[in-house]
Amino acid sequence: MANHDQQTVSSAAATTSASPSPVVLPKTSENEQLLRIRHSMSHVMAMAVQQLFPNARVTIGPWTESGFYYDFDNPEPFTEADLKAIKKGMIKIINKKLPLERVEVSRSEAEEKIKAQNEPYKLEILEGLQEPITLYTLGEDWWDLCAGPHVENTGQLNAKAFELESVAGAYWRGDETKAQLQRIYGTAWETAEQLAEHKRRKEEALRRDHRRIGKDLDLFSIEDEAGAGLVFWHPRGARMRLLIEEFWRQAHFEGGYELLYTPHVADISLWKTSGHLDFYAESMFGPMEVDEREYQLKPMNCPFHVLTYASKLRSYRELPIRWAELGTVYRYERPGVMHGLMRVRGFTQDDAHVFCLPEQISDEILKILDLTERILSTFDFNTYEINLSTRPEKSIGDDAVWDLATKGLIEALERKGWAYKIDEGGGAFYGPKIDLKIEDAIGRMWQCSTIQLDFNLPERFKLDYIAADGSKQRPIMIHRAIFGSLERFFGIMTENYAGDYPLWLAPEQVRLLPVTDEVQPYAESLLDQLTQAGVRATIDRSGDRLGKLIRTGEQMKIPVLAVIGAKEAEQNAVSLRSRRDGDLGVVAVADLLRAAQNANSQRAAGLELN
């Protein structure tokens, strides 16, 4: 089954799992040194916390992609003042140049030390470790269960290149039934200049936060009364979603796909057959009984497409079959991991499934790559990071089919000319896959598209086709999502554009600004012309002065503001102000209509008046 996961995004206000965040693996000596710095800094922080708060119990403290954190069980909540005191304590430890030394001990020795320090969480961690047990000491008075790596001494840490950033809630072992902890996040770098750049990038990310932009531009909301993780699309956001969906459908029809619509629920027996109840039950909403049958909301669209394939006898002459669906799915997400549109409980996946012959794999994958590039580049995502994940040790399926499928993926990527990295053994147990990350305007990489071969569902559902020799054969099944989650993609796209959407996609393309009541009838007539031409336009009827009309339009990031005074009305024209190009001067209405229609048909970023 394809699991086109949404991306987890940490939030300082959220309650998160007490488990390590993804890390940047050391690929160069420079990166490895940075990880050593961050890992060591987490120990320094834990030591400082326990010096200031002797009753604080420690749990885990890994490095992360941009820094480090440590989870504590402390009787009182940490405050901003506490963070300042902890930072001062850390600086003192750094200045002492205390050594960090690796020590191997037996299980019994480790248990004795842990019990002496009254560290129950470390005792639980110890249960899962094999001998020899490794500790790292920090000076003579503090130590931690740890495998490393670390710097040699705290003098190698730069006291001017770290910051404690926030406090969040976290559950021990990620289990909401267990103790709630306090997680202190920090960031650490080699130089003060790197720290300053990190802060600048973080401020820029906050400026681009899709949650703030979504509220400011009135695009969407999540209403507590309805429940967490359920998105309400407001009229302006709904317009944009419709534009995205229409483009997606057009691209798929042109790519040889047919569209499906499938139910939102299914009898529980379907989820047993598909394996979801065995492998995915924790992410599914519970069953509901209707007419003495149990149903569950779908967490994925795949089994429905499989049933559609199985609804009639298939011939090899029909293959490949390409089906796509904008299907809304429902998954249970813990409260702590939900984050705006990035991770929600009800979302729409742009799922597609291709049923093909083994010899068609490479061609079909190449077509998917071409379609992926066409769609993503339309939203100005042009830089990708691609990983090919191969067969893991535990897997199902015939060796020859695995080899053929993997070679097909490689061949398609090479025919496309895209660079890629191989993740040996990183594929799902049911097939190899390609994952594609996109880079946004400030250099962040986002997991987006997935292409996954599946040898599992065709076997579970006994799918077949009549081959040329009259025998029944299993089809190759390719799962594919380009956006992944439409909601999540909308959030990524919004942050990429910082809310300054290209003209073709803007919810309100042109705002008419009549400066006097006398030109109001002309403005109404122009609004009708624009609307009839397919241009999304409005009139500001507030009666405010021109300066405020313009400021309001700019705050709402309207791409084109059309000022209408007596002169413009007499000339059947408008004075245009473009967010992209500045003052465009007086423009005839006919030219505005033509340029706006061209922008829509060509999916252009702005008006081209020449």
UniProtKB/Swiss-Prot annotation:
Keyword check for ATP-binding: yes
Keywords carried by this UniProt record: Aminoacyl-tRNA synthetase, ATP-binding, Cytoplasm, Ligase, Metal-binding, Nucleotide-binding, Protein biosynthesis, RNA-binding, tRNA-binding, Zinc
EC number: 6.1.1.3
PROSITE patterns in UniProt: AA_TRNA_LIGASE_II
Region (Disordered): 1-29
Residues in coiled coil: none
Name of the protein described by the UniProt record: Threonine--tRNA ligase
Species annotation: Synechococcus sp. (strain WH7803)
Species lineage: Bacteria, Bacillati, Cyanobacteriota, Cyanophyceae, Synechococcales
